[in-house]
Amino acid sequence: MSDAKQNTPTKALVVFSGGQDSTTCLIQALSQYDEVHGITFDYGQRHRQEIEVAKSLATELKLASHKVMDTTLLNELAISALTRDAIPVSHELMNNGLPNTFVPGRNILFLTLAGIYAYQLGCDAIITGVCETDFSGYPDCRNEFVQSMQNSLALGMDKPLKIITPLMWLNKAETWALADKYQQLALVQHQTLTCYNGIVGKGCGDCPACVLRQRGLDDYLQNSQSVMDSLNSKL
């Protein structure tokens, strides 16, 4: 969708964690839709400070509404470094080839609940910041999975609800460029929470999420024009 809003009023629901990716998607959505809502999930996550960050950003960015939904049942079912404070976040993959920060079923649940809520709100689209290019080995960040969920929601609710993934084919440097394109680089850099240890902005600098975030930012700042050109070629 182009940045020019359409003549027919449009609504979107953003799956919004308060992190870099979802905040960037939210910023873009505000320029593309007449009405933007946010939904944040509280699943007892290790970095649960992100919920307060999401609330603050939702107010600052003037969302039409922002819902925080209790999904702590997921914490009981899914054992992960993100749902158990006693499990240290590891840089090594588990025996199944996945990082120990993978939360089984998380995006299945989140997109299902977002679909139900979007139906209630009358939204045209759900927007989520999952990414296959820079994804951390999570199977529920793949485009194939997202398309499958979109088809299931449309069939199950008899409504052509789209799941839009603006970052799916962007690398992390291009995601930073997208925030800069909307003049919100500083906000995303200093006010979002990506860190698995719950530290706002630059984060702990050590967990996998922080390493990926900082590497992308360094790449963008050192090669801003070429990265922006690459981003624009994908939009």
Curated annotation (Swiss-Prot):
Catalysis: reaction(s): 7-carboxy-7-deazaguanine + NH4(+) + ATP = 7-cyano-7-deazaguanine + ADP + phosphate + H2O + H(+)
Top enzyme class: ligase
Keyword ATP-binding annotated: yes
Enzyme Commission designation: 6.3.4.20
Cofactor(s) needed by this chain: Zn(2+)
Gene Ontology annotations of biological process type: queuosine biosynthetic process
Binding sites annotated in the UniProt record for Zn(2+): 195, 204, 207, 210
Gene Ontology molecular function, alphabetical: ATP binding; ligase activity, forming carbon-nitrogen bonds; zinc ion binding
UniProt-listed Gene3D superfamilies: HUPs
Keyword line: ATP-binding, Ligase, Metal-binding, Nucleotide-binding, Queuosine biosynthesis, Zinc
CDD domains: QueC-like (cd01995)
Residues bound to ATP: 16-26
Record-linked Pfam families: QueC (PF06508)
Cofactor note: Binds 1 zinc ion per subunit.
Pathway note: Purine metabolism; 7-cyano-7-deazaguanine biosynthesis
Family annotation (HAMAP family): QueC
Purpose: Catalyzes the ATP-dependent conversion of 7-carboxy-7-deazaguanine (CDG) to 7-cyano-7-deazaguanine (preQ(0)).
NCBIfam families, sorted: 7-cyano-7-deazaguanine synthase QueC, PRK11106.1
Family: Belongs to the QueC family.
Protein's name in the database: 7-cyano-7-deazaguanine synthase
The species this protein was found in: Shewanella frigidimarina (strain NCIMB 400)
Gene label: queC
